[in-house]
Amino acid sequence: MLRREFMKTATITAALAACGDVGDESQPASRHTKLIPPGSNGTVADVNGKHIYYSVHGAGKPLILLHGGIDPDSFGQNRDTLAKGRQVIAVHLQGHGRTPDSSRALRPETLSDDVAALIGYLKLGKADVMGYSLGAGVALQTAIRHAEAVDRLVLVSGALAKDGFYPEGVAAFDQLESHASEYGRAVKDSPLGQSYPDVDWTNLFSKTGAMTKRSYDWRADVVRLRARTLLVFADADAMRPEHIVEFWKALGGGHQDAGLDGSRRPANQLAILPNATHYTLAVDPRLPDIVEEFLATT
């Protein structure tokens, strides 16, 4: 029973993980972009051959917010907290929430093409992009594949490669597809399922499981990343601590002392929240302040 409950939790969490292959006057003038009119909530954009649902919250410099797998409301109240200082554009990825599925497989790479197309559709120029878990993988791929569309990047509990996760997490990834019907039925009857009754939950778990079974390794791509980046992890995350350090070093951190004046510190930043896990990080009330401070730095 304990193993069954662990695997249920872990496989649902696996769905949250990135897997694949293949102007506000408080902001610096150089980072201004065109803004969406306030109040344009609950809109569907026809982009990249898909109907992408997004909602707009707050005003200021746009921040594209990308949820974790399965749950389009992964950030909870943090979405609205972030919107107090900027314009948050919360996107529902393919097959999630109010964005319908298509015959296309789920992959962070192709999901990132949707995000970049949405940024272009909204005529934002460059936007800050923040993602959690699956959304972190999509955000990272957006910055890799569409560097012209991304200003700053916030990656919350994302991995460079599948081998960055603990072995039990990898095992959960590999079993998710085979349990799709079981988990789909469970979610359909949950508050999440009731909030989004049009989602085919079994299909979503099946396609997510097919994605999470695939190996991926983005190490070679990350070293060429141009977007200024904030990594956020929990002290008890789903990723091995060695992998977190590896990710940080790939972004230029952890190579030398910053010096008394901080002049040798990297442009990118790392935050590790204590008393947190992969499962609590997106809704952690400490997260918005960390993100806002990073986005506001010159």
Name each region found by the language model.
Residues K50-R98:
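Conserved HGGG/HGGXW glycine-rich cap/lid loop of the alpha/beta-hydrolase fold
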Residues P266-T298:
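Catalytic active-site module of serine/aspartate enzymes centered on a nucleophile-bearing elbow/loop
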Residues S206-D221:
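Active-site nucleophile elbow and catalytic-triad environment of alpha/beta-hydrolase enzymes
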Residues A238-Q269, L273-P274:
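Conserved loop-alpha-helix segment in the C-terminal half of the alpha/beta-hydrolase fold
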Residues A90-M130:
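Active-site loop/oxyanion-hole signature of alpha/beta-hydrolase fold enzymes
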Residues L140-R145, L153-V187:
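Flexible "cap/lid" loop of the alpha/beta hydrolase fold
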Residues L225, L231-F233:
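Short beta-strand/loop motif that positions the catalytic acidic residue
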Residues E5-G23:
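N-terminal export signals
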